Amino acid sequence: MEIKILNKTDTEIQVEIKGESHTMMNALKSCLLEDKAVKVATYDIEFPGISDPVLYVRTDKSEDPIDAIKVAAKKLADECDDFLKIFGKKAKA
């Protein structure tokens, strides 16, 4: 995975995330939208199968968009860890 910041202001960011698909982007977008400071979170894959996704996030002035992405990514990682633990226990049963 490579990450390239395309545009950044105090309240907006566009980030290209190379090598990712709708699976990761939808999950990240969902976590971002749970943050009250995030006003818009969306992504676009201009040409599926060819283009890399570009994430767009806009926040209110209370949170930097980079911090919002970091918080959402941590939350997503924690949710995956929880799933793995629960699934591991059930799979042994």
Swiss-Prot record:
It is found in: Cytoplasm. Its main location: cytoplasm. It holds the Pfam family RNA_pol_L_2. DNA-dependent RNA polymerase (RNAP) catalyzes the transcription of DNA into RNA using the four ribonucleoside triphosphates as substrates. It comes from the Archaea. Transmembrane segments: none annotated. The lineage of its organism: Archaea, Methanobacteriati, Methanobacteriota, Stenosarchaea group, Methanomicrobia. The gene is rpo11. NCBIfam families: PRK01146.2-1. This is DNA-directed RNA polymerase subunit Rpo11. InterPro entries: RBP11-like, RBP11-like_dimer, Rpo11-like. Belongs to the archaeal Rpo11/eukaryotic RPB11/RPC19 RNA polymerase subunit family. It comes from Methanocella arvoryzae (strain DSM 22066 / NBRC 105507 / MRE50). It catalyses: RNA(n) + a ribonucleoside 5'-triphosphate = RNA(n+1) + diphosphate. GO terms for molecular function: DNA-directed RNA polymerase activity; protein dimerization activity. Coiled coil: none annotated.
